[in-house]
UniProtKB/Swiss-Prot annotation:
Example GO BP: killing of cells of another organism
Gene Ontology molecular function, alphabetical: pore-forming activity
Subcellular location: Cell membrane
InterPro entries in UniProt: Channel_colicin_C (IPR000293), Channel_colicin_C_sf (IPR038283)
Gene Ontology annotations for the cellular component aspect, listed alphabetically: plasma membrane
SUPFAM superfamilies per UniProt: Colicin
Gene: caa
Pfam families, sorted: Colicin
Keywords carried by this UniProt record: Antibiotic, Antimicrobial, Bacteriocin, Cell membrane, Membrane, Plasmid, Transmembrane, Transmembrane helix
Protein name: Colicin-A
Principal place of residence: membrane
Membrane disposition: Multi-pass membrane protein
Family statement: Belongs to the channel forming colicin family.
Species this protein is from: Escherichia coli
């Protein structure tokens, strides 16, 4: 049990570093307030051991505050760029990288999870429906994965995607906002409000 707890802690610490790094990178486009929100999310991830992710309904209610914001309408060129970037993600390669984060899971299990996150993220960008992506994380927890490990793998996958983006700055900004919205919604309702009030409106 002690070993498992140690692996979990390591996963959360490394995921937290990855999200903070992603916040710094995307914060170059979105500004210091975004970096601060990403840092807050990263700190929450780091301390998530023993905690539970929010329910699907609560998380979706938070996320919908962001996606319903008219300023978050994504034009076709940006949407295509973001979908394309997901299509180019090598799930095995990403799982290997994430496998270095911790012994809390097997790389083979993560490949399948990366594939699912990719598939549901593409659906989110293409249809505007992020429910399937949120249900995916919930299904991991229902299958017996600790909330903290589920949050860690999920956040790390999205963070690795965001860090790999070689797309136009506006598209990077959109991906960054959505990543913070999706991960933040699983942790606390406050992140949606912060993104809406401090990042999205001023950016447009």
């Amino acid at each position: 049990v002690a070993e498992k707890a140690k692996d979990e802690r390591e996963l959360l610490e490394k995921t937290s570093e990855l999200i903070a790094g992603m916040g710094d990178k995307i914060g170059e486009h979105l500004g210091d307030k975004y970096k601060a929100i990403a840092k807050d999310i990263a700190d929450n991830i780091k301390n998530f051991q023993g905690k539970t992710i929010r329910s699907f309904d609560d998380a979706m209610a938070s996320l919908n505050k962001i996606t319903a914001n008219p300023a978050m309408k994504i034009n076709k060129a940006d949407r295509d760029a973001l979908v394309n970037a997901w299509k180019h993600v090598d799930a095995q390669d990403m799982a290997n990288k994430l496998g270095n984060l911790s012994k809390a899971f097997k790389v083979a299990d993560v490949v399948m999870k990366v594939e699912k996150v990719r598939e549901k993220s593409i659906e989110g960008y293409e249809t505007g429906n992020w429910g399937p992506l949120m249900l995916e994380v919930e299904s991991w927890v229902l299958s017996g994965i600790a909330s903290s490990v589920a949050l860690g793998i999920f956040s790390a996958t999205l963070g690795a995607y965001a860090l790999s983006l070689g797309v136009p700055a506006i598209a990077v900004g959109i991906a960054g906002i959505l990543l913070a919205a999706v991960v933040g919604a699983l942790i606390d309702d406050k992140f949606a409000d912060a993104l809406n009030n401090e990042i999205i409106r001023p950016a447009h």
